[in-house]
Amino acid sequence: MAGNIVKWWKHKILGGYKQFSVQECTTDSEELMYHQVRASSSCSAPPDLLLVSERDNNIQLRSPVVNIITTPPGNASGSASNKQQQLQQQQGHQHHHQAMPMPHTHASRHHHHQQQQQQQLPQDMSSSGSHTKHLRISSSSGGKHGKYANMQQQQQQQQTAAAATGVDEDVVDAAAAAAAAPHGAHQQMHSRHLHHHKEERIRLEEFTCDVSVEGGKSSQPLQFSFTFYDLDGHHGKITKDDIVGIVYTIYESIGKSVVVPHCGSKTINVRLTVSPEGKSKSAQQPAMAMGVVPASVPLPAAALGNNNNSNNNNNNKLKKLPTGLAAMSKQMNGGNGGGGALTTSAGTRRQHRYRPRKLIKSDDEDDDSNSEKEKERERERERESHAADQQPSGSGSKGAGSKSHHHHHHHGRYQKNQSGAKLEHQQQQQQQLCCADTPDNTYENMLNLKQDTQAAGNEATVPDCPSSHRQLHHQRQQDIYMKQATQRVKMLRRARKQKYQDHCLETRQRSLSVGNDSGNWQNRHLQQSLQQQPQAAHKSASVSPPPLAGELMLDGVQLRQPRPPHQSHHQQLQQQQQQRKSAECWKSALNRNDLISIIRESMEKNRLCFQLNGKPQANVSPIRQPAAQQQQQQQRQRSSTGSKIPTLIANHSPAAPQSPLSCSPPPCTLSLSLSSSNHPAAATCSIPVPAQAQAQGQAQAQAQVPAPPAVIEVGGGHHQHDHPQPHIPIYHQQLAINPAVLAAQHSHNSAHNKLNLCGYDSFLHATICGGGSAAHSPPPTPSNVATVQPIPKKSHNQKSLLQGYQRLEQQQQQRSSKDYKNYGNLIYAKLSEQLQQKEREQRRHRHKQQQQQHHHQQQQQQQQQQNQQQQQQQQPLKPKEESLAEQRPPTSSSSSAGSKIFGDALECAHLLASEEEDLPASPPLTHSTPSKVVSTDTLIDLNDDVGEAVAEAVTESGGKQQQQQALEADEGQEQEVELDTSASSSMIHRYVHEHIHHHYHHFKEQQDV
């Protein structure tokens, strides 16, 4: 379609009076690229993203191209600057001067030159108000009217429109016309300067397209605001895509409702107001006659007839148009017969456009939502256009507002469409301006304007064409226009398809961001508002972002909104990314649920650890699943795990009966599981280590858990990322750790006994009960902290201690830093400190006892290796019994944690601590549990505060640990080995809980497998 459009432009330019200005381009893109006017934007810049300078040039070419047409041949034949001056003068003065036939001839010549001039002038317009106004007037009235009367009428219309808009455009135009000669060169030079300058800067070009359908929805003045941005800094020439976007938008809004009789014609009055840089260039292109002729493209005569009809329709449409637009078009029409001529041009174009629409109508019927969006945009555009009508720039301001809004809505979707629509607006403006000439002239002028719009740069340098050339151009333009109509249909179809595909792509692309989708989905409204606000801020700044950017893509779900004002695609992407980041998975209920389900899945897989038999529970799906399925299953498991993990905790600890929130504290590991299950909402915090990792991300919003949140952070938005092998089921990950803990347990002679006594699986037993030996590990044992500690800061130091888990800890640290930020770090730290201090005191006592027992056991091991084994068995029994007695009331993991439970107790305490922050209700349980859980392990990896608390608690719990270690004293040496292994196990277990599936999987790879 683009190729056809380019070809059409070529034929129109080459075959038309501007053929010499047309550059023979192999491809549409090349032609657009190489066309002086359109080349810049078409190549590098998206069709929609056209530099305002080029866009202004195009717009000016659209409107001032009419001025060029208006300019007398003598003036038009003048140098581009002279022509521009003359055009301005002629626009202001000459179009009054020019005779009806002259404007056509002049229209072509002046169209060429004035395209150049207007290219320059748009900048000049921006630079000089008089030039701007004059240029505007030239574009609206001087343009295709080419005739003095038509120009006068056009000017009168413009003046009326300006008066209606409160802008003395014609007065300024008269002044500009007077100053046009001096200003012409000045504007030309200035405009050239501005043109280059504006190429550098982004200029806002807004098109207000008031589309009214004769009959039926003609009562619906549809205001389309198309804002084209040349964000590339290239000459923002309106591309076929722009026009297509505009046409398609119009078609989208009215095409569905407009039904053209089988062989009849339907007139759609499209009023295009092109306001470059807030300068009101009002070209009312009424009655884009949507003439449906058996031939796909109506003949120029038919088109001209339709143009005449469009002239009438334009009046009708003017009535139908929004007040400002209608007033403008009425002023345009009332000011001169040129108004009718303008309508005719619009009608002719609209006929052709409508045929494309009719061709596309079935497709357009597919875009009901788009038409609704169009309607919304049209309403907004109406408001904007009415405001613009009130603005000095008149319809230009109207175009600026409405177009900006509409284009923002449609820019992403309708970039192509808008480019095409922009061209069509130019053509429509040209038609409107040329309407005063003759239907043919209007048609030709419309085509010329279009041609000039695209080839304005090329044609700007081209000398004025003879009238014969213009006539040939007129004929060829008609043919080309028919081609263009056909191509426009294709463009519209393509634009519609592109928009549809863009929507689909948006939906798909949005769905591509799986990890952040939840956060985005949860925050999609926030993100949309955020995007819309910056986009609204950038409405006039940049509407270039691809359709994707326009429709907020959250959670990979396309939010079908009328395109919010589109920032540049990158800006929107950045905004979306930022918003997604701001609303990371943890913030999103979807990701939270997914993470919670993942954490619960890992927890249920951890149930292998938590279960007495260490066997996966029914609801645990250890099998790797797709992230979505895994998340869904995890979500299911969250509900089930929320109940089952508390059940496990309840089974394992009297504290298990805690409410899901209170359950999270009980067992370190289980409490994390309970956290995750108990805190499905706070799942971030309530989830076990992955839950904590998730909770970190989520609790960052909750800001409850400092260190375990680091773990929870994994469960949170990052939990998949946090885990070295996030895709590996948490079960496998946990199993990976379980073998590690089991290995530690096995390395600890009492590990199995503790495991059995704990009722935990070998991993959990090794971690928690085996944690007894881990508890034996002196509180300073950094491996415990290093391995499991979610503490982001301490874990860096501790991370060096355990190499195997260092990486995981680094992730934990990263998460934990977030956790510190996001969770109630102080709450968790304090709770975990209190709980862990108590538990650490117990641990320290136990650990001291255990250490003493280790030494004593070392002696005893020498003396009583059998006793050590017995004590190891007893230690699982006794510490487990102690921990069950002490910790099970708070949490089963604590109760089941013998001295090994301490190693995991810290981890559990961390998990609980993070869960505690997530679940302040659980602090008592966590209080009791961490006291034992922390006692279990010297790991001070909860948070920095929690780490300190753990250190204190480990010291405090040293007595208990020593007591338990006294029980384990016989196996003290082995438990010292277990201290390393069990400490590693507890650290591993804690670390696993912190990053449940991630670290479990990691450990699975390392140890389990």
Swiss-Prot record:
Q: Name one GO molecular function term.
A: zinc ion binding
Q: Name one GO cellular component term.
A: nucleus
Q: Where in the cell is it found?
A: Cell membrane; Cytoplasm; Nucleus
Q: Where is the composition biased (Basic residues)?
A: 349-359, 403-414, 843-857
Q: Where is the composition biased (Low complexity)?
A: 152-166, 526-535, 570-580, 624-638, 653-662, 858-875
The UniProt regions of compositional bias labelled Basic and acidic residues, in chain numbering, are 370-387
Boundaries of every EF-hand domain copy = 217-253
Q: Which family does it belong to?
A: Belongs to the NKD family.
According to UniProt, the name of this protein is Protein naked cuticle
GN (gene name): nkd
